[in-house]
């Protein structure tokens, strides 16, 4: 029988008992040993002390406090996989299912024993069979330096000269959604999804916009596969751009179509996501834009461990229109890397390239008043870079602010459609 006096006199023995108790989530053992360990450690930011207090807080049903401590611990040391597992379970108990599932998916990439994998799978199944409503929302601060995508002032060719100036706009974008799953039979379910988004600029309101999409369909999901079939309707509104600072919204377009998604875990580290969308777009005033839209997107995700992932993707977008000058095909590729660093720092880096080819020219061949590039179908080379930075230790009400630098460059066969711009965005989002 080991006494408290022996543990106080022998810190090595105390650690040999305390660390396994933390890993096993042995609530009684942690409760007995934590008070002894606290007497030896005067540093409140000691990792083992934080871990022990997180376990005790969860035992006392103080889930918000427990989650906060676990997040702090995993932020300091992302390699503590058993602390991450306990964080995921606490998130599940606090009904933060999306955040919990994200942590469980990261843990699957680690070299864990079969018993732990079984625990992860059981919690993942419970989340997949939830019938509760889920909600999400986000807001992003915007400070656009070239919202009208203007070319550089003074670009000229064939006696034509660019006179438009880049317009700035400050405001925010917003998004909100609600989703309800209803289990039908075993892994089959029906799904109802509402999603709305928009942009609001307080100093250049003619660029404001609102859109909403409603999806009703069904799906199948197990531990490795998910299939969704979701017919939808979508509406969008914007102000009259010919009226400066107009704040009255008018119906701009509507679409009816179908989404299909297939998500498949190839193994514990590789996941492939394929989405296909078919729709018919109709415009309220600009009827020349009416037409079908087809898009295909495929993304391959590799989670190397619980604090690092890589991804790549290819996309194809086909837009039909009555006016061939507005119909185009767009092929794109993208790749990126996400990393959780020590001390709570996280980063995400993405680069992309796209080729856009229009089906028709803007002007007729016999029009001698315009440059030659207006008489040929436009072709664009489109480049993008996104870098996102955030600190997992800095959050409030479950929201972690993220800052993104975005760079976009368009090289077009039509010189007046070539431009580049870079912006910073500040994002706040939450699932609940």
PLM segments and residue spans:
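Gram-negative and organellar
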Residues: 1-2, 19-24, 28-31, 42, ...
């Amino acid at each position: 029988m080991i006494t408290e006096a022996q543990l106080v006199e022998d810190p090595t023995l105390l650690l040999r008992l305390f660390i396994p108790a933390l890993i096993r989530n042995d609530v009684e053992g942690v409760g007995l040993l934590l008070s002894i360990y606290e007497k030896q450690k005067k540093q409140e930011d000691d990792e083992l002390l934080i871990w022990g207090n997180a376990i005790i807080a969860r035992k006392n049903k103080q889930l918000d406090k427990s989650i906060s401590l676990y997040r702090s611990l995993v932020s300091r040391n992302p390699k503590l996989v058993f602390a991450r597992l306990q964080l995921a379970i606490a998130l599940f108990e606090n009904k933060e299912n999306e955040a919990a599932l994200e942590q469980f998916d990261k843990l699957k990439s680690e070299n864990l024993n079969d018993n732990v994998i079984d625990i992860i799978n059981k919690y993942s199944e419970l989340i997949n069979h939830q019938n509760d409503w889920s909600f999400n929302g986000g807001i992003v601060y915007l400070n656009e330096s070239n919202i009208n995508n203007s070319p550089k002032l003074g670009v000229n060719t064939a006696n034509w000269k660019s006179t438009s100036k880049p317009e700035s706009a400050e405001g925010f974008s917003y998004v909100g959604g609600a989703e309800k799953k209803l289990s039908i039979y075993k892994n089959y379910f029906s799904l109802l999804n509402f999603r709305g988004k928009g942009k609001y600029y307080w100093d250049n309101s003619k660029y404001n916009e609102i859109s909403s999409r409603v999806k009703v369909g069904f799906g199948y999901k197990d531990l490795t596969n998910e299939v969704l079939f979701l017919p939808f309707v979508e509406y969008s509104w914007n102000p009259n751009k010919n009226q400066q600072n107009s704040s009255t919204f008018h119906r701009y377009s509507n679409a009816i179509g179908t989404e299909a998604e297939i998500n498949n875990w190839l193994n514990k580290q590789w996941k492939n996501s394929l989405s296909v969308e078919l729709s018919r777009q109709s415009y309220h005033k600009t009827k020349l834009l009416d037409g079908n839209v087809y898009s295909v997107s495929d993304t391959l995700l590799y989670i190397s461990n619980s604090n690092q992932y890589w991804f790549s993707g290819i996309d194809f977008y086909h837009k039909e229109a009555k006016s061939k000058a507005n119909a185009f095909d767009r092929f794109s590729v993208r790749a990126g890397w996400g990393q959780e660093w020590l001390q709570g720092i996280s980063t995400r880096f993405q680069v992309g390239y796209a080729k856009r080819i229009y089906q028709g020219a803007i002007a007729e061949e016999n029009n001698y008043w315009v440059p030659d590039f207006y008489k040929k179908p436009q072709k664009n080379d489109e480049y993008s870079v996104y870098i996102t930075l955030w600190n997992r230790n800095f959050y409030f009400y479950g929201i972690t602010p993220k800052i993104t630098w975005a760079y976009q460059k368009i090289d077009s066969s039509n010189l007046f459609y070539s431009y580049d711009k870079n912006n910073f965005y500040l994002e706040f989002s939450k699932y609940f």
